[in-house]
Curated annotation (Swiss-Prot):
Heterodimer of PSME1 and PSME2, which forms a hexameric ring. PSME1 can form homoheptamers. Gene3D superfamilies: Proteasome activator pa28, C-terminal domain (1.20.120.180), Proteasome activator pa28, N-terminal domain (1.20.5.120). GO terms for biological process: antigen processing and presentation of exogenous antigen. Pfam families: PA28_C, PA28_N. InterPro entries: PA28_C, PA28_C_sf, PA28_N_sf, Proteasome_activ_PA28, Proteasome_activ_PA28_N, Proteasome_activ_sf. It comes from Mus musculus. Keywords: Proteasome. This is Proteasome activator complex subunit 1. Residues 59-102 are annotated as: Disordered.
Length: 249
């Protein structure tokens, strides 16, 4: 039978790491998870996440609508100037030209909520990673028979994988919001007479507000579901075959 020789000192370090990680994880499950469930549930009940009238989220969009007469005169002068310039230089000027207004700020209400949400995403992702590692360290040596406990471990691990995938999407969603809002603001600045672009900015803010509430809810639910399923199956997860056997890793 092939065996892997491991120095006692190295094995001792691995054992210390394993014991420390298991202790941290069980402390998380016993006290930290219930605390986070309560905190996030309270966050969901705050007025900041329960705005009934979404029009109150509207942020100032300081993009003036130019006077049509002045714009027409300006356009005529521009056309005359373009005739006298080379095509490449004209294109360069167009690329370098800024919007016909000052800086347009982010929606402060949305930014404030995101500043509270992003640390929660980071936290739950790290805790989920820790619990996943703990579960993997409970997997026994692969053997025939008496694998019901191992099947329970696999089901819980599958749940954790799905939660991790969902949490990864939160960062993408936040970045996508700012990208799409920036594009909408740029279009509104470039074509200030088109009201649809202005309205698009407000629609994106309202949609992001609802997404933020859903993300907080999903994080709370992730803590609650993990806490519940691990608590109900703790014995099977900890000792899938009724006794502690060698780690698979």
């Amino acid at each position: 039978m092939a065996t892997l020789r491991v120095h006692p000192e190295a094995q001792a370090k691995v054992d210390v790491f394993r014991e420390d990680l298991c202790s941290k994880t069980e402390n998380l499950l016993g006290s930290y998870f219930p605390k986070k469930i309560s905190e996030l549930d309270a966050f969901l009940k705050e007025p900041a996440l329960n705005e009934a009238n979404l029009s109150n989220l509207k942020a100032p969009l300081d993009i003036p609508v130019p006077d049509p007469v002045k714009e027409k005169e300006k356009e005529e002068r521009k056309k005359q100037q373009e005739k006298e310039e080379k095509e490449e230089k004209k294109k360069g000027d167009e690329d370098d030209k800024g919007p016909p207004c000052g800086p347009v700020n982010c929606n402060e209400k949305i930014v404030v909520l995101l500043q509270r949400l992003k640390p929660e995403i980071k936290d739950v992702t790290e805790q989920l990673n820790l619990v996943t590692t703990w579960l993997q360290l409970q997997i026994p040596r692969i053997e025939d028979g008496n694998n019901f406990g191992v099947a329970v471990q696999e089901k819980v691990f599958e749940l954790m994988t799905n939660l991790h995938t969902k949490l990864e999407g939160f960062h993408t969603q936040i970045s996508k919001y700012f990208s799409e809002r920036g594009d909408a603001v740029a279009k509104a600045a470039k074509q200030p007479h088109v009201g649809d672009y202005r309205q698009l900015v407000h629609e994106l803010d309202e949609a992001e507000y609802q997404e933020i509430r859903l993300m907080v809810m999903e994080i709370r639910n992730a803590y609650a579901v993990l806490y519940d399923i691990i608590l109900k199956n703790f014995e099977k997860l900890k000792k899938p075959r009724g006794e502690t056997k060698g780690m698979i890793y």
